[in-house]
Amino acid sequence: MRSLLVVGVVLVGLTAACGTADPPSRRQAPSPGSPAVSPASPAAASASVRCDEGMDGAAAPPADFQVVGGAVALPTSDVREAALQASEATMPDGSPGSFAKQGLLVRRGRHVELSVPESLTGRTWLVWGKPGSPGARVVADRCQGDKEWIAFPGGYLVRDMGCLPIRVRVDGGAVQEVLIGVGAPCPGQGPAPQI
């Protein structure tokens, strides 16, 4: 019974807009699930998601997540009807930006690398884990769990909202690029929900 409740909570957390969570800020501590970012701790070019930072997972990703490379599930513009909701946040360099809280699902036992194109480095950061370290590239390395999919809290830190290209590489294979609407829609998507 407990595991069903936890799976339900994880899936609701991954698919909900999550607009009530406070984004990172210089004036307030990050809330649970928000990245710990401050001007004193600039983002690394690359960050790792520690396996022990995952939440209880799920047997399968939600319907509005696309499975990429058979090992990572993301809310891409191909399957999600609306952009992710984003709220004001402080970027790793102290400048204003936005944070879209959205969990990451990784298939157990797989090596997954997510990154943004070089043209977005310094303007876009990926953050997953507890508390999570922002980076232009994030790696989850062969995590194990009771469920097929392991959930990691976190999301996307962006200087400018828009349609964000995310590059995915699984087990050292070919890079695949998907689009995620962060605060603003990708072509074919509706706007982010308003609260």
Q: Which role does the model predict for each range below?
A:
Residues 5, 19-195:
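Non-catalytic macromolecular-recognition regions in eukaryotic signaling proteins
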